[in-house]
């Protein structure tokens, strides 16, 4: 659910209409094509769900460690702290604390239990020690937000000071945008889930030999897109719809139902051996999505995910509306 996305106010759309002028045989053939397509989609979802169940097992048990887990282990092995000078302040930080700052900064807000899982390989004790040190130095702030079931979730955000310190640390690529504080508290849990979704997708990319080099949230995508649109729309001689199509293509996006579709998150990654940069646009759909909105995201080419408890409902909608898209479980 991209921030600012309003579900359509018109009636839910209907699936592809049958051509009444076609022969019964053609309609039967089209019906079988739809059935086979949905069977392929369901098969892919079942295989993905099975991989998820296997991946949730502990490393060192029935599966080898993931590349991310191996990198984290190397970071955790370095326990000494280094002095970092920022103007008139000196911070004492070890690599795992810098890594935690980057994780929180890239996603604005991160659940504490998710940070332990993905940035500390489940070592909650080490994470709590790091958070205490970061908090004492005024670099992070702990906040409690409500999840979709209205249960409290402990989260972390960067403070302005933490954001500035991270910017000066040179621990990130210069083009990687970072954030501090809660911009829209009502949407905070959605951002929390994007952090987990990011690691799910990036683990899959790395499992196929790729390397994620940058992540862009919809905040950044919208900022760049709208700035480009505003600049070009100053030329009144150009057709607005033509401009919209051209700008969307320039940003690797599509216009569907006369609107530029914006994903929740874009991962940029490189594949060996060419190291050419590829992108993957992902959308975290919720139970509030109407079929028309879900269809627009699918037609835009986004990889669609949903919480485990909501994926089944969205898949039923997909089947009823004959949408040609896989819905993965988060």
Model-derived features: positions:
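Electrostatic, structured charged patches in enzyme active sites and in nucleic-acid/phosphate-binding
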Residues: 1-105, 113-118, 137-330
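Flexible coil/turn residues that form the inter-helical turn or adjacent wing/linker of helix-turn-helix
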Residues: 108
């Amino acid at each position: 659910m991209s921030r600012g996305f309003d579900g359509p106010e018109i009636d839910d759309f209907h699936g592809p209409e049958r051509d009444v002028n076609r022969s019964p045989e053609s309609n039967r053939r089209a019906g079988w094509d739809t059935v086979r397509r949905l069977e392929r989609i369901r098969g892919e979802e079942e295989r993905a769900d099975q991989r998820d169940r296997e991946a949730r097992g502990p490393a060192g048990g029935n599966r080898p460690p993931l590349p991310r887990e191996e990198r984290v282990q190397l970071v955790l092995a370095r326990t000494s702290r280094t002095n970092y000078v920022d103007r008139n302040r000196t911070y004492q930080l070890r690599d795992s604390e810098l890594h935690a700052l980057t994780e929180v900064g890239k996603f604005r807000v991160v659940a504490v239990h998710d940070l332990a899982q993905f940035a500390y390989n489940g070592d909650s004790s080490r994470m709590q020690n790091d958070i205490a040190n970061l908090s004492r130095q005024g670099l992070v702030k702990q906040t409690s937000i409500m999840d979709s079931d209205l249960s409290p979730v402990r989260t972390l955000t960067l403070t302005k000071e933490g954001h500035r310190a991270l910017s000066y640390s040179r621990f990130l690529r210069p083009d990687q945008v970072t954030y501090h504080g809660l911009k829209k508290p009502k949407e905070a849990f959605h951002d929390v889930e994007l952090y987990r979704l990011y690691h799910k997708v990036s683990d899959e990319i790395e499992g196929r030999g790729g390397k994620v080099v940058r992540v862009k949230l919809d905040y950044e995508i919208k900022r760049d897109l709208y700035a480009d649109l505003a600049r070009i729309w100053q030329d009144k001689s150009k057709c607005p719809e033509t401009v919209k199509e051209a700008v969307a293509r320039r940003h690797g996006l599509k216009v569907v139902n006369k609107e530029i579709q914006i994903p929740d998150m874009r991962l940029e990654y490189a594949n060996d051996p060419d190291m050419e940069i590829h992108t993957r646009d992902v959308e975290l759909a919720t139970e509030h999505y109407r079929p028309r909105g879900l269809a627009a995201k699918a037609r835009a080419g986004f990889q669609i995910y949903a919480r485990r408890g909501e994926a089944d409902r969205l898949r039923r909608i997909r089947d009823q509306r004959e949408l040609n898209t896989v819905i993965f479980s988060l």
